[in-house]
Amino acid sequence: MKVLQMFFCVILLCVTSVLVEAKSTTKGDETASKRNFAQFAAMTYHTTHRWPKKYVGYGCYCGLGGYGIPVDPIDECCKTHDACYKKVEDSGICSYSWAIYLTIYKRKGGAECSEDNEKCQMEVCKCDSVAAKCLGKYKDIFNEKYAGYDKKGKCDPSFTLS
């Protein structure tokens, strides 16, 4: 049942974020995925035991785009994740700017990155791992009032991520 729930969740996340065809293959205890987003969803589910879709649109930073002041520590985790991706993108270690969203990296299961990753893969995996662990740390303070949050109306756009 959990496998079916996770598969359904990954499909919903991919549709929500306009990323299509989230397929996974498993080799030993390392997982490679066709889309980085599906891997982050798997890490998040592992650390929070919550459907990752619940975090899409949470607060001012969780999901696509983010600005303003984080509403709580969970939203701060998402802001940090956005900043981590931006740092990797700005560093130029990945071959093109959208690589951070499409990079296939290897995990040791859970929210741990495999040592058998190229530099771009490893940095993207680290961003996802740190964020998933952060979300797991604060899983008990998840507040439904911040799910589906009105970013345009409630997040202060003068505090954009730069």
Curated annotation (Swiss-Prot):
Localisation: Secreted; Nematocyst
Biological role stated in the UniProt entry: PLA2 catalyzes the calcium-dependent hydrolysis of the 2-acyl groups in 3-sn-phosphoglycerides.
Enzyme class: hydrolase
Pfam families: Phospholip_A2_1
Maturation propeptide residues: 23-35
Reactions accelerated catalytically: a 1,2-diacyl-sn-glycero-3-phosphocholine + H2O = a 1-acyl-sn-glycero-3-phosphocholine + a fatty acid + H(+)
PROSITE patterns: PA2_HIS
Domain of life according to the entry: Eukaryota
Signal peptide range in chain numbering: 1-22
Name of the protein: Phospholipase A2
Cofactor: Ca(2+)
EC number annotated for this UniProt entry: 3.1.1.4
Annotated binding of Ca(2+), by residue: Y61, G63, G65, D82
Reported tissue expression: Expressed both outside and in acontia, a specialised envenomation structure laden with batteries of venom-containing nematocysts found only in the superfamily Metridioidea.
Co-factor remark: Binds 1 Ca(2+) ion.
Membership in a protein family: Belongs to the phospholipase A2 family. Group I subfamily. D49 sub-subfamily.
Keyword Phosphoprotein: no
Entries under InterPro entries matching the protein: PLipase_A2 (IPR001211), PLipase_A2_dom (IPR016090), PLipase_A2_dom_sf (IPR036444), PLipase_A2_His_AS (IPR033113)
UniProt keyword annotations, A-Z: Calcium, Cleavage on pair of basic residues, Disulfide bond, Hydrolase, Lipid degradation, Lipid metabolism, Metal-binding, Nematocyst, Secreted, Signal
Disulfide links within the chain: C60-C155, C62-C78, C77-C134, C84-C127, C94-C120, C113-C125
Active site: H81, D128
